[in-house]
Swiss-Prot record:
Its main location: other. Regulates photoreceptor cell deactivation. Arr1 and Arr2 proteins are mediators of rhodopsin inactivation and are essential for the termination of the phototransduction cascade. Involved in regulating normal cycles of per nuclear accumulation in brain circadian neurons and thus is important for normal circadian behavior. In the dark, functions with Arr2 to promote the formation of cytosolic Bdbt foci, which are required for dco localization to photoreceptor nuclei where it phosphorylates and activates degradation of per. Phosphorylated, but does not undergo light-induced phosphorylation. One of its GO terms (molecular function) is opsin binding. Disulfide bonds: none annotated. One of its GO terms (cellular component) is rhabdomere. Belongs to the arrestin family. This is Phosrestin-2. It holds the Pfam family Arrestin_N. It is found in: Cell projection, Rhabdomere.
Length: 364
């Protein structure tokens, strides 16, 4: 039986160093992250010269526009999270994966394995969408596996002998659903004997990308006001952790209706509204959080960021959340009544077979 496995391949500009990796997405299960493993192959000349080869995990966090940068001021942090010397090999025990074992047999004596562990507290791969005309680097978090040669890992790398391969830190949806979201809000009015009550319920807490969200709305009007319109929307919350005032929200799907309205005093109304948040409907809007880009066409809205606790939030990164918001409009003098329910929007964890089929064969 012949067993095929898929790998990503990238060479340095001078063709002296080649990197092989079997995946570019690494799953964060909140408590730990999958190890980053690969194989580095050196040219015979580098081996004879006994060149030192280093591998690093680099996190690039851009928190401002390139056009706004001035001399001496950069809105970007580049952090080296892990650094290792691969060649000459250091004395360390590496537990090889099956892919590494097969590649070592295939590629010969100039092949060297490496394994790096990403810190669990490192942020997820998220970038903020730009306008189509903007060709500058997007704001957000991106990861790279960097391979270079030098006397030490602090040396400045030369472009011709350096490899930078983009990877992503991703989170997949939990296997179990949480508690069904439900909220009730009431509002009383001056010179009104009763209250206006709004009850909102979602059919579940966890949704997958592209799935329809059912918003169940129940309005009980015991006041002397008149409900003239109902609006339901999905809002994406973006928190740039580096800044104290770095929180903002974007409405990514909405629906409004006057069906059943005006809702007069003493009346009640039950209604179900359906919302589908997608990136296709927001592809021309700047500031929408999307999945980290590694030159793929299947980019989607950024998934909800899961963290073990509020104390685990790092000093950098972008935290994404989602909520359904329902508004009752009561006219110019009556104001509004709002209810909000958070929910989780994520991808289901793909099977290993599906991952291999999606990755294709060897990519440069």
């Amino acid at each position: 039986m012949v067993v095929n496995f898929k790998v990503f391949k990238k060479c340095s500009p001078n063709n002296m160093i080649t990197l092989y990796m079997n995946r570019r997405d690494f799953v964060d299960s909140v408590t730990q992250v999958e190890p980053i493993d690969g194989i580095i192959v050196l040219d015979d000349e580098y081996v004879r010269q006994n060149r030192k080869i280093f591998v690093q995990l680099v996190c690039n966090f851009r928190y401002g526009r390139e056009d706004d940068e001035m001399i001496g001021l950069r809105f970007q942090k580049e952090l080296t999270l892990v650094s290792q010397q691969v060649c000459p090999p250091q004395k360390q025990d590496i537990q090889l994966t099956k892919m590494q074992e097969r590649l070592l047999k295939k590629l010969g004596s100039n092949a060297y394995p490496f394994v790096m562990q990403m810190p669990p507290s490192s942020p997820a791969s998220v970038v903020l969408q730009q306008k189509a005309s903007d060709e500058s680097q997007p704001c957000g978090v991106q990861y790279f596996v960097k391979i270079f040669t030098g006397d030490s890992d602090c040396d400045r790398s030369h472009r011709r002998s350096t490899i930078n391969l983009g990877i992503r830190k991703v989170q997949y949806a939990p296997t179990k659903q949480g508690i069904q979201p439900c909220t009730v809000v009431r509002k009383d009015f001056l010179l009104s004997p009763g209250e206006l009550e709004l009850e909102v319920t979602l059919d579940k807490q966890l949704y997958h990308h592209g799935e329809k969200i059912s918003v169940n709305i129940c309005v009980r009007n015991n006041s002397n006001k008149v409900v003239k319109k109902i609006k339901a929307m999905v809002q994406q919350g973006v928190d740039v952790v580096l800044f104290q005032n770095g929180q903002f929200r974007n409405t990514i799907a909405f629906m409004e209706t006057s069906e059943g309205c005006p809702l007069n005093p003493g009346s009640s109304l039950q209604k179900v509204m359906y919302l589908v948040p997608t990136l296709v409907a927001n592809c021309d809007r700047a500031g929408i959080a999307v999945e980290g880009d590694i030159k793929r066409k299947d980019t989607a809205l950024a998934s909800t960021t899961l963290i073990a606790s509020q104390d685990a939030r790092d000093a950098f990164g972008i935290i994404v959340s989602y909520a359904v918001k329902v508004k009752l409009f009561l006219g110019a003098l009556g104001g509004e009544l709002c209810a909000e329910l958070p929910f989780i929007l994520m991808h289901p964890k793909p099977s290993r077979k599906a991952q291999l089929e999606a990755e294709g064969s060897i990519e440069a």
